Amino acid sequence: TQPRYLIGFKNGVYDLRENAFRAHKPEDWLLNHNGITFTQPLAANECLEVHASNFYKWLSHAAGRDAGKMERIKAGLFMVLANRSDWQLFLEITGEGGSGKSVFTHIATLLTGEHNTASGNMAALDSARGRAQFVGKSLILLPDQSKYVGEGTGIKAITGGDLLEIDGKYEKQFSIILQ
């Protein structure tokens, strides 16, 4: 599997241990990247409010201008970017219509890469066939879930780090731990 300390970009990797960007190397074992071209920060004094003003406006709006909430939203997005499922497996994004939930989802998808993202529902997590769409994905979206009536065995197995049966169409069944 991909080392957790590397974030794959189109033009290289960001090494979190070294706190530096560098070129791709075969020994990194990266199978994919997020599709974003990494650019170096403009200066030591770069800040969101000035250099990413539209993002900052959305962040302020989504957090109700609460600095603590803004930090938690940024932490959640960093967790998605760095694929840190060991910190938290699930983020539940709630709020009224127009509060920024969909924007968060779109930013998270951008940071992960569309090819690394899958969308489904709780029922899909409970069936071996339904789980097949999530294999190899680093971001699973379960948008606007209606009332779920089921056992929740799939989500329990994922959070417990258990092996899950996968039954992809026209493929041999196998087991995997989804992270």
PLM region spans:
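A broad "ordered helical/assembly scaffold" signature
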Residues: 77-88, 153, 163, 174-178
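Conserved AAA+/SF3 P-loop NTPase catalytic/coupling segment centered on the Walker-B
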Residues: 138-161, 174-175
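AAA+/SF3 P-loop NTPase mechanochemical coupling elements
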Residues: 129-136, 167-179
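P-loop NTPase catalytic core of nucleic-acid-dependent motor ATPases
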Residues: 2, 6, 13-138
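Substrate-gripping "pore-loop 1 plus following alpha2 helix"
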Residues: 118-126, 153-172
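Anionic group-transfer/hydrolysis microenvironments
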Residues: 17, 145, 169
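Short, well-ordered loop/turn and helix-capping segments at boundaries between secondary-structure elements
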Residues: 83, 110, 114, 147, ...
